[in-house]
Structure formats: structure tokens, C-alpha cells
Amino acid sequence: MSLAFIDPMIIRSLNKSKLRKKILYLLYKMYPHGIYLSEISRRVRSDPSNVLGCLKGMNGRYNGHFSLIELGLVECVERGGVKIYKLTDYGKKIVEVLKDQDSDFIESLRW
């Protein structure tokens, strides 16, 4: 199923942050399973606080309105006291639409 329309705020959010895009593509690779914060951080090679900012928003640097969770692309599920982040079905559809446009970006990622 393809999307006829992608919210411009999603495009803006992903274009403003390579880290948001990396996290989104990592979670797409893990779909339908989730992954915890420190593992995301390790795989995208970024500080956990920056990863959390991309996922949930952070004062100043990462606007909460453009966070992956706020945009409906990622969800946080708590299992046994551990927060697991996973791509939503909507997030999966967005990535599938965008991945052809981002083929050069995807090839540059080294998991």
C-alpha cells in the first residue's frame, strides 16, 4: 500500500536531522521488533541523549513537535520496566515511500 500524501512536517523533520533519519531507518530494519535506547544509540553511533531527543524531543536542540514519536512514526512500549522503541505501521509506510528517494543516504549507513 502506498501513501498518496506525506505530511510536510514529516519531510521537514527528517530533512533537518540526519540522526532522526538514521534512527527511522534502523527501526525499519528491525521492524516489527523494537529496540532499547542504548542499543539504538550504539548502532547509529550517537549519544543516548541525542537519540532520545530525536525520539521524544528535548528542550532546545530537538523540538518535541518534530520528534519521531510525536509525528506518529515511532512508538515507545514498556516491557518489564524497559522502554522499547519500535516503528509504527504508519512509520513503516512512510519509510517505504521515502527509501527510493534516500537510496544514497541508505547506502552510506553502516550497521
Curated annotation (Swiss-Prot):
> Could you tell me which Pfam families the record lists for this protein?
EarA
- Superkingdom per UniProt: Archaea
Signal peptide span? none
Where are its TM segments located? Answer: none
Identify the SUPFAM superfamilies for this entry: Winged helix' DNA-binding domain
Gene3D superfamilies, per this entry?
Answer: Winged helix-like DNA-binding domain superfamily/Winged helix DNA-binding domain
Q: What is this protein called?
A: Uncharacterized protein MJ0905
What species was this sequence derived from? Methanocaldococcus jannaschii (strain ATCC 43067 / DSM 2661 / JAL-1 / JCM 10045 / NBRC 100440)
